[in-house]
Curated annotation (Swiss-Prot):
Gene behind the chain: metK
Species this protein is from: Vibrio atlanticus (strain LGP32)
Top enzyme category: transferase
Family: Belongs to the AdoMet synthase family.
Protein name in the entry: S-adenosylmethionine synthase
Subunit and interaction comment: Homotetramer; dimer of dimers.
Amino acids binding Mg(2+): 17
Length: 383
């Protein structure tokens, strides 16, 4: 593949699906802050004037679901009926039940180290050295654009913006290296009074130019800013939102494979989440160690069983040492049992709400982004 294009998209914290993700993770955080061993699977549905929170929770904690929901919506910025959604007046329905004891008997063990996986499934982790944070550039810059949109909206710099927004960036590659940006799409909800030309100019000057590196922009780069011309009706009034519907935005923007399991609202006993974080941690440390330029890890689990049923390492021909050495390094230096990866990544803490917008990976504040194993792996491989 000599020359090619690759595109990824992101959505803002005010996108309906992301509202749902953030509510689910806010509930999770509130519960595990009181009860770190709680079992939580929290799903959220949002539509005009309504939020429904459901799922299965087994815990000794008590949390105020309604207040958590309203505060989350308020922080995002839906605070007036003019936006089609209002934190203070929306209905909040709570339909949470308990997790099945059939699951508990497979997960909970006398020795915590023998804790079984909360479900079967496959999970992928990925890293590439095309950016300093070892993430693919298209998803990285798509996230940065909508994050900047929220920043200038909340600061009042562009006070005509509203919470809902989407971005999309197409990168040009030659021999696997970035040579430029081919296209940029940014659509943002706005108030009715701003004109389309004024909005487009403001978005270009205050969002796009400060975020995208100038050396990747050229005269042939295409910009599509609110291409329909009008985006007043947005958020839950424009579309209903559901937890777990932005799994590619949450991960690698399509640059790596995905096992299908969503993250938000799930406690760390759910390997859909915790093992995907661990797989990223492993892949990132392999690349940081210089063992490969690109790395994808696949893990699989059986419900109630501690050890992974399989571990796969793919380096796409970019490995600097024998493939067998990389695999052995993974087996000797990472505990990928559910209990082991929870301990390794310190997952039993209330850090999940902040993961629920702008991507779960490539953000240094999260423990699975540490490269503390890189030196150990490099030494193991003789690099």
């Amino acid at each position: 593949m000599a020359k090619h294009l690759f595109t990824s998209e992101s959505v803002s914290e005010g996108h309906p699906d992301k509202i749902a993700d953030q509510i689910s993770d806010a509930v999770l955080d509130a519960i595990i802050e009181q009860d770190p061993k709680a079992r939580v699977a929290c799903e959220t549905y949002v539509k005009t004037g309504m939020v429904m929170v459901g799922g299965e929770v087994t815990t000794s904690a008590w949390v105020d679901i309604e207040e958590i929901t309203r505060e989350t919506v308020r922080e995002i910025g839906y605070v007036h009926s003019d936006m089609g959604f209002d934190a203070d007046s929306c209905a909040v329905l709570n339909t949470i039940g308990k997790q099945s004891p059939d699951i508990n008997q497979g997960v909970d063990k006398a020795d915590p180290k023998d804790q079984g996986a909360g479900d079967q499934g496959i999970m992928f982790g990925y890293a590439t050295n095309e950016t300093p944070i070892l993430m693919p550039a298209p998803i990285t810059y798509s996230h940065l654009l909508v994050k900047k949109q929220a920043e200038v909206r909340k600061s009042g710099k562009l006070d005509f913006l509203r919470p809902d927004a989407k971005s999309q960036v197409t990168f040009q590659y030659d021999q696997g290296k970035i040579v430029g940006i081919d296209a940029v799409v940014l659509s943002t909800q706005h108030c009715d009074s701003v004109t389309t030309p004024d909005l487009r100019e403001a978005v270009m000057e205050e969002i796009i130019k400060p975020v995208l590196p100038a050396e990747w922009i050229n005269k042939d780069t295409n910009f599509f800013i609110n291409p329909t011309g009008r985006f007043v009706i947005g958020g839950p009034m424009g579309d209903c939102g559901l937890t777990g519907r932005k799994i590619i935005v949450d991960t690698y923007g399509g640059a790596a494979r995905h096992g299908g399991g969503a993250f938000s609202g799930k406690d760390p006993s759910k390997v859909d989440r915790s093992a995907a974080y661990a797989a990223r941690y492993v892949a990132k440390n392999i690349v940081a160690a210089g063992m490969a330029d690109r790395c994808e890890i696949q893990l699989s689990y059986a419900i109630g069983v501690a050890d992974p049923t399989s571990i796969m390492v793919e380096t796409f021909g970019t490995e600097k040492v024998a493939h067998e050495i990389i695999i052995e390094a993974v087996r000797q230096n990472f505990d990928l049992r559910p209990y082991g990866l929870q301990e390794m990544l310190n997952l039993l803490q209330p850090i999940y709400k902040q993961t629920a917008a702008y991507g779960h990976f490539g953000r240094e504040e999260f423990p699975w982004e540490a490269t503390d194993k890189a030196a150990i792996l490099a030494d193991f491989a003789g690099l």
